[in-house]
A protein has these predicted regions:
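Bacterial N-terminal signal peptides
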Residues: 7-17
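Small-residue-enriched, tightly packed secondary-structure blocks
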Residues: 23-179
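Positively charged n-region of N-terminal signal peptides that target proteins for export
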Residues: 1-4
């Protein structure tokens, strides 16, 4: 009898929890999509040439806000979305750990454009890491006209605020959660 009552109580509770969690995850991707679109609009306002990167890409990632801080050891974290064919296909989490001379904090947006299917597929496998040898282009008016895809990728950052001094080494890692 106890087992039957336990099952009758736990089963609906588990189903409700699962449905609530999936609704929460959907809301998260919708909210991130709105913020990503706002960041992309800002990027286009600073440099309209970004449209050429979007049109040449098989997919792109927009991380609207990356928070970065450091004092000897530093880190960064941000969440955004992966777009393929104009639609959100995954939530992307960026994490970074760095060691070296660094002090301060800053916030920025990050944009990754994938020129071809192999580079996008490599990113989507989830074991993708941007090391110290990969550089991002800081967005200023007209900068994307001089930027180019390197190894199938183009990466841009747009400062939102803060001040950080650094001479550090560390890589960015990305984790994807599909819809």
């Amino acid at each position: 009898m106890k087992k039957l009552l336990f099952s009758a109580f736990i089963t609906p509770l588990a189903l409700t929890s699962t449905l609530a969690l999936s609704a929460w995850e959907k809301d998260e991707s919708v909210e991130l999509d709105v913020k990503a679109q706002e960041a992309l609009t800002e990027f286009k306002a600073v440099d309209p040439e970004v449209e050429s990167f979007i049109s040449q890409s098989v997919g792109y990632v927009v991380i609207p806000t990356v928070g970065k801080a450091g004092f000897g050891i530093g880190g960064a974290r941000g969440k955004g979305v992966l777009y393929e064919n104009g639609a959100v296909t995954a939530v992307v989490t960026l994490t970074q750990l760095s060691i070296g001379f660094q002090w301060g904090g800053q916030a920025y947006s990050e944009f990754l454009f994938f020129q071809d299917t192999p580079s996008l597929s490599n990113f989507k496998r989830g074991n993708y890491e941007l090391g110290a040898q990969v550089s991002a282009v800081a967005i200023t008016a007209g900068v994307s006209a001089d930027a180019a895809f390197v190894n199938g990728m183009a990466i841009f950052t747009h400062a939102k605020g803060g001040l950080m001094y650094e001479a550090s080494v560390g890589g960015q890692k990305f984790k994807l959660e599909g819809k």
